A protein has these predicted regions:
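Membrane-embedded alpha-helical modules
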Residues: 2-99, 209-311
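Short alpha-helical transmembrane interface motifs in multi-pass membrane proteins
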Residues: 4, 124-129, 167-171, 226-229
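Membrane-interfacial loop-to-helix junctions in multi-pass transporters
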Residues: 29-32, 56, 115-124, 153-160, ...
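Hydrophobic, membrane-embedded alpha-helices of multi-pass small-molecule transporters
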Residues: 57-61, 79-80, 95, 112-141, ...
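Juxtamembrane interface elements at the cytosolic ends of transmembrane helices
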Residues: 63-68, 79, 99-104, 132-149, ...
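Intrinsically disordered, low-complexity non-transmembrane regions of multi-pass membrane transporters
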Residues: 100-113, 147-150, 160, 299-315
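Membrane-embedded helical hairpins/re-entrant loop segments and their flanking transmembrane helices
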Residues: 128-197, 313
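N-terminal glycine-/lysine-enriched basic segments
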Residues: 203-206
Length: 315
């Protein structure tokens, strides 16, 4: 994880220094739209699985979320997800679908458990290729945020990649898991229409404070699957729609086979969650779909260029 984080930092610095023009050439709207859409749609089975574990609670959470967004404006409307999740949690408690034993056993104060990382050079070649997929996913997230907010955040792409790398490196040194940009957060932004970075500064500070209270962590871990299923149906769906919005805004012409294939193949790979295993490393639908979008687009363009040159050589 540390090596992946360092690689992301290097890529982020290069992008920040060199600029993002080459990214626009490598990731045109049809590619970024496909990547963003497949990120959201790839997570649909997770929403379905959670929903089926508590359909009543999930349905109530989903209906309350949609109703609150439709009926209320201002602060209440922006907190629709929070209110719906809390209401679903309370209903699950009433129905006895929440295991409170871990909450009762957890202390009020305590430090998180840190682990000392072990470095194994043999596994580095397996992890570093994942950087390609992470870069594509991260850039797709940045573009979706820009599309959603109507702001040109492309110049910040390098910083986003570097920050992701720094966070992953620090997490690796502490024995934690890799960090990345999350589609769920983009879905929350789309649903609440709160785009201020100040909200994330505050959220980060609050999260650090709450991490010192194991009881809070246990309560969050005990959130019933039904509640998560109801909420993520909306959140994941919104991320998928953002990808489609990128196509519409940039007037992607789907009469062209190039654009058809670039969108169709990655979407199927992502939605079906294709997997490819190399030793102990597993590439899932999002990573494979992102790579497929790049390979299909640039591969077909290369073949089209070669086709145009062949008659000239023959002449």
């Amino acid at each position: 994880m540390v090596a992946v984080g360092v690689a992301l930092v290097v890529i982020g610095v290069v992008v920040h220094r060199v600029g993002t023009h080459w990214i626009d050439l490598a990731l045109p709207p049809v590619v970024t739209g496909a990547i963003v859409a497949l990120i959201g749609f790839n997570l649909a089975p997770a929403a379905k699985s959670n929903f089926e574990k508590g359909p009543v609670v999930g349905l109530v959470t989903l209906v309350l979320l949609v109703a609150t967004l439709a009926f209320f404006r201002g602060i209440v409307g922006r907190l629709a997800i929070f209110f719906a999740v809390v209401a679903g949690y309370v209903l699950a408690l009433i129905l006895g679908e929440v295991d409170t034993s871990a909450i009762a056993a957890a202390p009020w104060l305590g430090l998180p458990e840190f682990q000392t990382p072990r470095f194994t050079l043999a596994v580095l070649p397996l992890f570093l290729p994942a950087v390609i997929a992470l870069v594509g996913e991260n850039i797709g997230h940045v573009k979706s945020v820009g599309q959603m907010t109507g702001t040109d955040v492309a110049p910040l792409t390098g910083r986003a990649l570097a920050a992701d790398g720094v966070a992953t490196t620090l997490a690796g040194f502490g024995g934690g898991s890799a960090t990345t940009t999350y589609a769920e957060n983009i879905g929350v932004m789309a649903a609440t229409r709160v785009y201020s970075t100040a909200a994330y500064w505050i959220a980060a500070a609050v999260a650090i404070v709450l991490s010192l209270c194991p009881k809070v962590g246990a309560a969050i871990s005990a959130v019933p699957p039904g509640v998560l299923g109801g909420a993520t149906i909306v959140l994941y769906g919104l991320v998928g729609v953002l990808g489609i919005r990128i196509w519409l805004t940039n007037h992607v012409d789907f009469n062209k086979p190039l654009n058809q294939m670039t969108a169709a193949i990655p979407l199927i790979i992502g939605i079906a969650d294709f997997t490819w295993r190399v030793g102990d490393l597993t590439f899932t639908g999002i990573a494979l779909g992102s790579i497929a979008a790049l390979l299909v687009y640039h591969g077909m363009r290369l073949l089209s260029t070669a086709r145009e040159l062949i008659p000239q050589r023959g002449a």
